[in-house]
UniProtKB/Swiss-Prot annotation:
SUPFAM superfamilies: Ribosomal protein L10-like (SSF160369). GO terms for cellular component: ribonucleoprotein complex; ribosome. This is Large ribosomal subunit protein uL10. The keyword Oxidoreductase does not apply. One of its GO terms (biological process) is translation. InterPro entries: Ribosomal_uL10, Ribosomal_uL10-like_sf, Ribosomal_uL10_bac, Ribosomal_uL10_bac_type. Belongs to the universal ribosomal protein uL10 family. One of its GO terms (molecular function) is large ribosomal subunit rRNA binding.
Length: 167
């Protein structure tokens, strides 16, 4: 027979593992959301490769301490859910923030991104950062522009010399 304490130990180990593996973990207060709204948020998270989980605060506090993320412990008050992102550190904050704009009952409480705790305005600002793919595309675009301009310049010089040679 499995004891309740063993189940709780497994849950703490699971949460600890998720906190350690995640690029970001965003704590949200879902109080006041209807079941359909929570289901929609879960769906949006799944579509982006995120994980939306509700755990008991006591177990989450123990897991945060085990994972060396003590700064998160103070934020675990009231009904909380955690949105985990394992690849893109911005994705969880972005999905939660976008959902909160249309659903006023969802509150972003705190976010742990690569070991740094963000709150309130900092978290909103962090959520506004473009995704990794967009940033890479912008960087590559900025590299491409000077090279393209240089190629056009060389072509113009070659065309001019060719025109002078024919005249």
């Amino acid at each position: 027979m499995v004891k309740a304490i063993d189940i709780k130990k497994e849950q703490v180990a699971e949460i600890t593992d998720k906190l350690q593996r995640s690029a970001s973990a965003i704590v949200v207060d879902y109080r006041g959301l209807k079941v359909e709204e929570v289901t929609e948020l879960r769906k949006q998270c799944r579509e982006k490769g995120l994980e939306y989980k509700v755990y008991k605060n006591t177990l989450t506090r123990l897991a945060a301490e085990n994972a060396g993320m003590k700064e998160l412990v103070g934020e675990l008050v009231g009904p909380n859910a955690i949105v985990f992102s394992y690849d893109d550190p911005v994705a969880a904050a972005k999905v939660a923030s976008e959902f909160a704009k249309t659903h006023k009952n969802l509150e972003l409480k705190a976010g742990l991104v690569e070991g740094v705790l963000y709150k309130d305005a900092q978290l909103e600002e962090f959520a506004s950062i473009p995704s990794r793919e967009v940033l890479i595309a912008k960087l590559l675009g900025s590299f491409k522009a000077p090279i393209s301009n240089f190629a056009y310049l060389i072509k113009a010089i070659a065309d001019k010399k060719e025109a002078e040679g024919q005249a």
